[in-house]
């Protein structure tokens, strides 16, 4: 949990306070957000453990994002989705836990849809510094979660290596 919090907190602050890709309802990150990332990560980890392992199966889970991403990019609603899709497939292809990243793509989208529907946060329609557009939330917001999960997995692996010496 501490490793998740160590990455989730600064990443949230960077994305919301520096990059400004989304904004919280009262302009400040609620204290429950980093812990919420741990709960979502743990749920994703548990679901991924119950699914058949393998990069090929994980790729199939992410596959439905392709037509939606292309449609949204073509219409101009979410041009950032093309890049996020490539990032997501990169994590599924080369990351240490491909099924986790595939599962997190869907869990993150569900959670982000719920949070935006509640009005807890809103994503910027124009992604700062990039010239890209984003849906509210971006269809592949799960790529940001997968980035955090990759960092957590690699860090945890290193910590365990050091402890086992």
What are these regions (language model features)?
Residues 1-165:
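Aromatic-rich, lipid-facing transmembrane alpha helices and their immediate juxtamembrane interface loops
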